Amino acid sequence: MKNKIYIAIICAFSIVFAVSSGFLIKHYCDSAKQAEMYDNLIEVVETEPEETTELMNYSEEKTFIPEYQELYLQNNDMVGWIKIEDTKINYPVMQSKDNPNFYLKHGFDKAYTDYGCPYVQENCDMELPSDNIIIYGHHMNDGSMFAGLMKFKDKSFWEKHKTVSFDTLTDRQTYEVIAVFKTVVYTDSPDSFKYYQFVNAETAEDFTAYVEKCKKLSLYETGITAEYGDKLLTLSTCEYSRTNGRLVVVAKLINE
């Protein structure tokens, strides 16, 4: 009887080990695949386009930035490119209005992946644009996707990295960070700030109230604010010190 119990325990542990190993191998393979794919996309973005490249019209007034045109032709859900120095944040940004959270679990190539791809909230208008463009990205343990936003918790990092590059398909843009804060979502707790509900201000007072709330929650004072008429960029990722925690970086457009 003892031998049977012993054998059963060994078998159980073996199954658990095999399943765990399978998950680890799958995760490693996924990580390697995503890293290779985005490295290839970065190479396209950082390679000087050929002078003979014929630029497509994005609208009546604007043409594509050459390197982004090539990527757009691969996936027309692409709406921009985000980069933050000294982090791994150097990615295409997507938007799927018909399937809002598609890129939560799909990469640039539209294949399923736990890494997803940074994406814009579905009710944000990239054309007008909206007063606030909200971008989501995963906080991955290997430091990829939006895990690099965690560095902004340290004021000394912000002091050396006060700007974020977020280009649209037609315009190169720089944003200046005005606030970095932590909050919780999916709860009616007093600690919850539903920053994702602010896309367009109906009045100047609405805009000011949102900015003041962000500044009040900020982990440190940046000395920078925004006024009605400014365009905002809000970057959001998971923050694991609390259940349903989020780290949010808010910036304002300073050039276009």
Label every PLM stretch briefly.
Residues 1-14:
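N-terminal Sec-pathway targeting helices
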Residues 17-256:
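Solvent-exposed, non-transmembrane regions of membrane-associated and secreted proteins
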